[in-house]
Amino acid sequence: MSTAVLLSGGLDSAVLAADEAMRGEMCPVYVSVGLAWEEAERAMVADFLARAPLNGRARPLASLGVDMRDVYAATHWAMAGRPPAYDTPDEDVYLPGRNVVLLSKAAVYCAAAQIDRLVIGTLAHNPFPDATPEFRTAMARALSLGLGRPLDIDAPYANSRKADVIRRGAALGVRFELTLSCMNPRLPSALSPQSSALSPQLSTIHCGACSKCRERHDAFAEAGIADPTTYAISVNLR
């Protein structure tokens, strides 16, 4: 049975994709909604899929879109590219309905492609209402009814912390430098002369100043695994 994986370019979904490829055919799905960092995400997704340990079991990427720019205002931080600060609580970076949109569009694709299982990289302690088991169960039921075919929506890492996922990714041979956990990624050419020397192979740099960078940095420390990420600044990392 094929499984569709919502792949965002991030660490959690990348490890999930590699994990699912160990079990059978995996179809990566990327859904664009118009967020400021999506160009960098798409580039990272393409790079990851080209070099990831997927055992030859990955279908070509399904790149889908749902334009949410008429819902989230142009001044919204996620649209304007001005993410909340490094120490912002997770609750304050909520994008209302994001998982509703991602799962809905991916589910329609799954129905067309005759895929009966869709997985998302939700982790433990996610505070958002569209990340709960109750939501996923209700969503799967509604989409199965509406599409006229069964669809299982699963979150295999729902009881795992990001550090646990990093350890799993290391065991699978995932190249973490090919993942992106940043709300304000930048190209090397945009960095200041004072920034650290960068590898010429790197195309996308983590800002080091947003809450996603903090979460990533801290999770590598908790996992006891060296963080291969290049951050534009390191002043806030601890």
What role is predicted for each listed range?
Residues 71-72, 77-79, 182, 220, ...:
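Short clusters of hydrophobic/aromatic residues that line enzyme substrate/ligand-binding pockets
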Residues 238:
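Iron-sulfur (Fe-S) cluster-binding modules
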Residues 1-173, 191, 198, 202-204:
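ATP-dependent adenylation/nucleotidyltransferase module used to activate substrates
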Residues 224-235:
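Short cysteine/histidine-rich metal-coordination sites, predominantly Zn2+-binding motifs
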Residues 104, 178-187, 205-218:
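Local cysteine-cluster metal-coordination motifs and their immediate loop/turn environment
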Residues 12-14, 125, 212-215, 228:
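Short, electropositive, low-hydrophobicity segments enriched in small/polar residues
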Residues 216-226:
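Hydrophobic/basic alpha-helical segments enriched in Actinobacteria
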